[in-house]
Amino acid sequence: MASLPHPKIVKKHTKKFKRHHSDRYHRVAENWRKQKGIDSVVRRRFRGNISQPKIGYGSNKKTKFLSPSGHKTFLVANVKDLETLTMHTKTYAAEIAHNISAKNRVVILARAKALGIKVTNPKGRLALEA
């Protein structure tokens, strides 16, 4: 269940990159769009304007896609999918897909516990229907 040793996970930028003027106009969604105007102060990176996504904010290759526990997540839809993780319990953790019923989740969780596989969302859907 414990993960392999890895460098400290550092997130260089945790805030979402918001689209310019999304706070000013309701019709402008928050999803990031690159500014392309010739006079755009955001594109020209003037002081005091919103920051833009750039390659420097990228994560370390060794810690990219790692969860805080140090595992990479693997989407599981049935018990058969769990069998693929038996040799990789220190590297990968199972994540039960969103559309799996509570009945099947119980079966998957029991098998994961027997195999010693970490599950990232063990309480999903079970707390409501217990």
Swiss-Prot record:
GO cellular-component term (any): cytosol
An MF annotation (GO) of this entry: structural constituent of ribosome
Complex and partners: Component of the large ribosomal subunit (LSU). Mature yeast ribosomes consist of a small (40S) and a large (60S) subunit. The 40S small subunit contains 1 molecule of ribosomal RNA (18S rRNA) and 33 different proteins (encoded by 57 genes). The large 60S subunit contains 3 rRNA molecules (25S, 5.8S and 5S rRNA) and 46 different proteins (encoded by 81 genes).
UniProt family annotation: Belongs to the eukaryotic ribosomal protein eL32 family.
Listed PROSITE patterns: RIBOSOMAL_L32E
Protein name stated in the entry: Large ribosomal subunit protein eL32
Annotated keywords: Cytoplasm, Phosphoprotein, Ribonucleoprotein, Ribosomal protein
UniProt xrefs under InterPro entries: Ribosomal_eL32 (IPR001515), Ribosomal_eL32_CS (IPR018263), Ribosomal_eL32_sf (IPR036351)
Pfam families per the UniProt record, alphabetical: Ribosomal_L32e (PF01655)
GO terms for biological process, alphabetical: cytoplasmic translation
SMART domains named in the record: Ribosomal_L32e (SM01393)
Function according to Swiss-Prot or TrEMBL: Component of the ribosome, a large ribonucleoprotein complex responsible for the synthesis of proteins in the cell. The small ribosomal subunit (SSU) binds messenger RNAs (mRNAs) and translates the encoded message by selecting cognate aminoacyl-transfer RNA (tRNA) molecules. The large subunit (LSU) contains the ribosomal catalytic site termed the peptidyl transferase center (PTC), which catalyzes the formation of peptide bonds, thereby polymerizing the amino acids delivered by tRNAs into a polypeptide chain.
Localization (cell): Cytoplasm
CDD domains in the cross-refs: Ribosomal_L32_L32e
